[in-house]
Amino acid sequence: MSKALPLLTRQGERIAITHGLRTPFARQATAFHGIPALELGRMVVSELLARSEISPDVIEQLVFGQVVQMPEAPNIAREIVLASALSVHTDAWSVSRACATSFQAVANVAESLMIGHIQAGIAGGADSSSVLPIGVSKKLARLLVDASKTRSLAQKLKLFSGLRPRDLLPVAPAVAEYSTGLRMGDSAEQMAKNHGITREQQDALALRSHQRAAHAWQQGLLNDEVMTACVPPWEQPFEQDNNVRAESKMQDYARLRPAFDRRHGTVTAANSTPLTDGAAAVILMTASRARELGIAPLGFLRSYAFSAIDVRQDMLLGPSYASPLALDRAGITLADLSLIDMHEAFAAQTLANLKMFADERFAREVLDRPRALGEVDMERFNVLGGSIAYGHPFAATGARMITQTLNELRRRGGGLGLVTACAAGGLGAAMVLEVDS
């Protein structure tokens, strides 16, 4: 175990997370159809400020992320500042770390707090899979640039005369890794085969995720951390995630065909997280600033870590690499955790990471650690369900997980929680959260 690295300001104060909020998450082309990520982000930041009753002038920085970026608003963070009640003098910039984007946003605000540049900031992310930057072919794009340099209609017509009908077809955003051409689901299939994870195991985890998420909603556990959204055509408010299947059964999952490896695969639409729209954000500040404002924090950021691995083999094992680092930096072990929340991009990916947490050979030969983290107690794991049930607006998921875990720790009387995620490009993220008893 490496030496613990406490996250403290120069004055020795802890980094407090005082508030967290998200929109309900909506499956692609449903409740948020036509609502861009920028509007979702503005919506959640505005409501977060209103609920916190913190003066907008207190917030000195906004770090916000978006994975599927819109060309017309490349700095979503600054646009949210300008569209919300935040002061126009609020510093703002955008980040992208694929599915770990809001983890990165939280880390950036925490770093600003630690070095003393600010005393309070907001971190979060938003994504829309319903409002996408549909592009044009490379040939047409090049001709459009060339045409802008011509002077006469004849010159323009000559340029476009070489176009073919296929050159005019719209081009959707890529769903594959740029470096390998593999889709996320292809990597999940690879991991299922490499780690001996069966279709039944994947379906069982997916069913568990939906059952626990449905129970969380039924018990009102999420009411205070999910806002009601009112969007066009203003017919009715949108109050709960619409992907959670409360009545599903194992036989329902067994009926679906593989989505990626059609002949021999085990990854289906049901044991994967769906394309989703939504936004989430948290407020961070120094412990002293929270005291000055009379705010009791939800909890504290104890440590964080990021990792990067080869994209060609087990690309989604990021949690198995980042989590040991985060635990080391927090000065704790797996046994010290009250809760573990892992992003469920796919059931296969989640189960593979759980295996690697307990794999002694992986620890010694791959991580160069003397021992594995250990077996995960499933009674502490994704206790309210995970991304398979809630959905996954890429840049918003981390902030959802952080808020959800802090609130659950508070319900349990305090403790330590690990939140961790894989991300495209072979990236991983992990954070240790702390709630005082």
From Swiss-Prot:
It is an enzyme of class 2 (transferase). It is found in: Cytoplasm. It catalyses: an acyl-CoA + acetyl-CoA = a 3-oxoacyl-CoA + CoA. CDD domains: thiolase. One of its GO terms (biological process) is fatty acid beta-oxidation. GO terms for cellular component: cytosol. Keywords: Acyltransferase, Cytoplasm, Fatty acid metabolism, Lipid degradation, Lipid metabolism, Transferase. It holds the Pfam family Thiolase_C. Pathway: Lipid metabolism; fatty acid beta-oxidation. The active site is at C99, H392, C422. InterPro entries: Ac-CoA_C-AcTrfase_FadI, Thiolase, Thiolase-like, Thiolase_acyl_enz_int_AS, Thiolase_AS, Thiolase_C, Thiolase_CS, Thiolase_N. Its EC number is 2.3.1.16. GO terms for molecular function: acetyl-CoA C-acyltransferase activity. Catalyzes the final step of fatty acid oxidation in which acetyl-CoA is released and the CoA ester of a fatty acid two carbons shorter is formed. Belongs to the thiolase-like superfamily. Thiolase family. Heterotetramer of two alpha chains (FadJ) and two beta chains (FadI). This is 3-ketoacyl-CoA thiolase. It comes from Erwinia tasmaniensis (strain DSM 17950 / CFBP 7177 / CIP 109463 / NCPPB 4357 / Et1/99).
